[in-house]
Amino acid sequence: MNSIEFPLLDRTTQNSVISTTSNDLSNWSRLSSLWPLLYGTSCCFIEFASLIGSRFDFDRYGLVPRSSPRQADLILTAGTVTMKMAPSLVRLYEQMPEPKYVIAMGACTITGGMFSTDSYSTVRGVDKLIPVDVYLPGCPPKPEAVIDAITKLRKKVSREISEDRIGSQQENRCFTTNHKFHVGRSTHTGNYDQGLLYQSPSTSEISSETFFKYKSSVSSHELVN
């Protein structure tokens, strides 16, 4: 497992007093106490549940699962995200205090998976709703891969600068690595307008004249069938 680049200590005096910067101290405290909000909707989340056991013991990384987004600084999405649950996911992310991070776990969360080919209600990538810091592919990813993703996120936190973090835009916070996959022909655009998520469902009203006109032109047997 790769070692984490902890913030450097400036100097140590003769009285064993350690001096450092406030930015390094803040990064060290945050990377050592990530509190995740677990958002599992499918089978990938079962692999994450195995991390709670004694074999992997993810508590040693300072991870304390929280049930409230207001107490979490990391949200881990695992499983398929549908259009109906998209507003709830966006609302949970907006309720999390800054700085906050996102780990997308599994193929269904990253691209929609096998449900994105012929499903009209599947979001083809959670990054169309919220910014993602670490992508964790797999179907499902192994617990060791989840630990590696958390390690990469901790490295990212250790290198952050408070001024850059405040001034950076949300769309530029993604963290990923180069891959060797070849991009094929796109069959689905997967572009979703977040403004549509907050609109109330429209109701179509049929006038009584149109209804009775259609009813008179169709026999009662056809209406039953």
From Swiss-Prot:
Record keywords, A-Z: 4Fe-4S, Chloroplast, Iron, Iron-sulfur, Membrane, Metal-binding, NAD, NADP, Plastid, Plastoquinone, Quinone, Thylakoid, Translocase, Transport
Q: Which PROSITE patterns match?
A: COMPLEX1_20K
Name the domain of life this protein comes from: Eukaryota
Any Gene Ontology biological process: electron transport coupled proton transport
Residues that bind [4Fe-4S] cluster, according to the entry?
43-44, 108, 139
What cellular component terms from Gene Ontology apply here? chloroplast thylakoid membrane; respiratory chain complex I
Provide the membrane topology annotation: Peripheral membrane protein
Q: Quote the catalytic activity from the record.
A: a plastoquinone + NADH + (n+1) H(+)(in) = a plastoquinol + NAD(+) + n H(+)(out); a plastoquinone + NADPH + (n+1) H(+)(in) = a plastoquinol + NADP(+) + n H(+)(out)
EC number assigned by the record: 7.1.1.-
Note on how the cofactor is bound: Binds 1 [4Fe-4S] cluster.
- Which cofactors, by name? [4Fe-4S] cluster
Instruction: Kindly indicate whether the keyword Signal belongs to this entry.
Output: no
GO molecular function terms noted in the UniProt entry: 4 iron, 4 sulfur cluster binding; iron ion binding; NADH dehydrogenase (ubiquinone) activity; quinone binding
Class of enzymatic activity (EC top level): translocase
What is any Pfam family matched here? Answer: Oxidored_q6
* Localization of this protein: Plastid, Chloroplast thylakoid membrane
**What does the annotation say about its assembly with partners?**
NDH is composed of at least 16 different subunits, 5 of which are encoded in the nucleus.
Q: Which family is it part of?
A: Belongs to the complex I 20 kDa subunit family.
Q: What does this protein do?
A: NDH shuttles electrons from NAD(P)H:plastoquinone, via FMN and iron-sulfur (Fe-S) centers, to quinones in the photosynthetic chain and possibly in a chloroplast respiratory chain. The immediate electron acceptor for the enzyme in this species is believed to be plastoquinone. Couples the redox reaction to proton translocation, and thus conserves the redox energy in a proton gradient.
HAMAP family annotated for this entry? NDH1_NuoB
What is the name of the protein in this document?
NAD(P)H-quinone oxidoreductase subunit K, chloroplastic
